[in-house]
UniProtKB/Swiss-Prot annotation:
MF-aspect GO terms: G protein-coupled receptor activity; olfactory receptor activity
Lineage, highest ranks first: Eukaryota, Metazoa, Chordata, Craniata, Vertebrata
Organism: Homo sapiens (Human)
Entries under Pfam families matching the protein: 7tm_4 (PF13853)
Protein name, per record: Olfactory receptor 1N1
Positions on the Cytoplasmic side per record topology: 48-55, 119-137, 218-234, 291-311
Amino acid sequence: MENQSSISEFFLRGISAPPEQQQSLFGIFLCMYLVTLTGNLLIILAIGSDLHLHTPMYFFLANLSFVDMGLTSSTVTKMLVNIQTRHHTISYTGCLTQMYFFLMFGDLDSFFLAAMAYDRYVAICHPLCYSTVMRPQVCALMLALCWVLTNIVALTHTFLMARLSFCVTGEIAHFFCDITPVLKLSCSDTHINEMMVFVLGGTVLIVPFLCIVTSYIHIVPAILRVRTRGGVGKAFSTCSSHLCVVCVFYGTLFSAYLCPPSIASEEKDIAAAAMYTIVTPMLNPFIYSLRNKDMKGALKRLFSHRSIVSS
């Protein structure tokens, strides 16, 4: 039996489309990728250039935008190259590298959304303690903890995958190297891998989600108790944007990874993964800029400043 050292590359099936539609597919995903990069970069620039947004909430939002760019780049760039060159292969090392970055950025998305929910909980439910609880040192510690934990999880999955044997060069039924499709190609015992996918995957998915739900269980009644219209409007503005992103993110994530195999076909899995890795990061900047008054103001000031400089 050959081991993993004899495997040089995998074949990525990609998104099913007739050959004559491949260029159209390339154009669509290239446009979506550029919109994602532009939108999230504008969010980062707006937050960095506006002193009014130098708060914990927008600190995590800027990091979330950076992670969204990384999540999309880790999967879409290789797919675009494969479509354009019509060479749908990825090296063994490239596959493991892509898997690592996809897992790290995907898990960071979940953790940052939970951190933002906790920030809103402290700001709305315990406003007098906010400056103490969410001081810069605490935010930096939370950020570092998120990066460390997600790197550990991603490295664990990657190292466990690297120990497996692959008898033949196989076809990955996906457009990137996700864990489950690659595991199906192994001729080794994948019991440990599957157990770690269940344990670690469930932890990094469910625990942040429960933190978000718990935070909003306390936030919603607190908002309803606010008597001034201005106070309700400001609280609702920041929370509604975050809730929209949470719903889109976890909705696509659950569709991609928690649907029973007997119900979801491979095509539906690929479509759900595309929503999670491509569409969601593209929509996030629009959600925050359309529903958040502070962000809309910061973007207007950013563009007005640049127009003055250019003139």
